[in-house]
């Protein structure tokens, strides 16, 4: 195996080659759902998109199951690229704010607990997971379709 040192932040030739291979082989890996009454595929239109996975789409595993990439397409971005109009952007923005505030509070709490115990905050925080925040946001977007991810 040849290892190379990348000193240029630009897209490398091997990355372009790999992206091409993924685009070529991805259709062979698609999962098709049971189709009844011509319900799938859904025609592009207005969609109310909700859920943490809409913008924070999970693209792989964790640890060795994760893949470092420059960019990956989120559910929101993919639906927009397919011609859908996302009508719930205000909800997603509000949800992002709720999560950001919850994360800030979580980090402050972990740092405080570590200080009280006399433990390094980084070490104390390892393995701790922020719980999903509780929130009440109106589900008031309109559309031809609603999707929760």
Question: For each predicted feature, which ranges?
Answer:
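C-terminal non-catalytic regions of proteins with extracellular/luminal or membrane-system context
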Residues: 1-149
